[in-house]
Structures are given as C-alpha cells and as structure tokens.
Amino acid sequence: MKDPYDVVKRHYVTEKAKMLEGLSLGGGEGKKKGSFCKDPKYTFVVAGDATKPMIAEAIEAIYSNKGVKVKKVNTVCVKPQPTRIFRGKRKGRTAGFKKAIVTFVDGHSIG
C-alpha cells in the first residue's frame, strides 16, 4: 500500500462539505425525511489514481488514534473550470482533482 498521505492529500472544506458534515449532528431525527443522517460524512481531496479500498485504508490509517471505521466511500472527479486571468485578457483553467466523500460508521467521527 502507498503512504496514506500520498492517497489522501487534504481535508476538503467548502460550504457544501461543511453542510454535509453538519447533517450528522442531528442524530437521525428530523422533520423531513433525509434532513439528518446518523452516519457522519467527511470530504477529502485524494490522488487521481486512488481507488475506493485504498482511500478507506488510508483514512483508517491516518485517523487510527481515533479508532474510526469507514462504512462507505464515494468518489467524484471534479472537472477543470474555465477562468479569466489578468482582467479577462488571458483565459485559463483551474486544476481538476478527485474528491472522496467518506461515510463513517455510526458513532465514529474525526471532529
């Protein structure tokens, strides 16, 4: 297996990712179906060639001191987006990357 820090690059922090983490704080009860979930979910930026089993092993190795268990891993390849640089004169693209949404077993958390 590769070094876990080569597979998982960093924690991915956006408004949508934080909202997804916050859904697990409700304990599974909510007025609407699906408004809360029991299993906590966290988002990470991973290597482009990483597979789901590799990501699960790396997350469990990195957070072994907290004793987390991975239940499920979903991956998304984010495409590069067009940008304008230098007052719109030059056109470019942002870098594409792969992100993983990791679901932990109920009761396990990294936060």
From Swiss-Prot:
Family named by the database record: Belongs to the universal ribosomal protein uL23 family.
Q: What is this protein called?
A: Large ribosomal subunit protein uL23
Origin, by domain of life?
Bacteria
A GO BP entry is:
translation
In terms of SUPFAM superfamilies, this protein maps to: Ribosomal proteins S24e, L23 and L15e (SSF54189)
Function per UniProt: One of the early assembly proteins it binds 23S rRNA. One of the proteins that surrounds the polypeptide exit tunnel on the outside of the ribosome. Forms the main docking site for trigger factor binding to the ribosome.
Among the Pfam families in the record, one is Ribosomal_L23
Gene (name only) = rplW
A Gene Ontology molecular function term of the record: structural constituent of ribosome
Q: Does the keyword rRNA-binding apply?
A: yes
Among InterPro entries, the record links this protein to: Nucleotide-bd_a/b_plait_sf, Ribosomal_uL23-like, Ribosomal_uL23/eL15/eS24_sf
- HAMAP family according to UniProt: Ribosomal_uL23_B
User: Cellular component GO terms, alphabetically?
Assistant: ribonucleoprotein complex; ribosome
Per the UniProt record, the source organism is Chlamydia muridarum (strain MoPn / Nigg)
Report quaternary structure and partners: Part of the 50S ribosomal subunit. Contacts protein L29, and trigger factor when it is bound to the ribosome.
Q: What are the entry keywords? A: Ribonucleoprotein, Ribosomal protein, RNA-binding, rRNA-binding
The answer to keyword Protein biosynthesis applying to this record is no
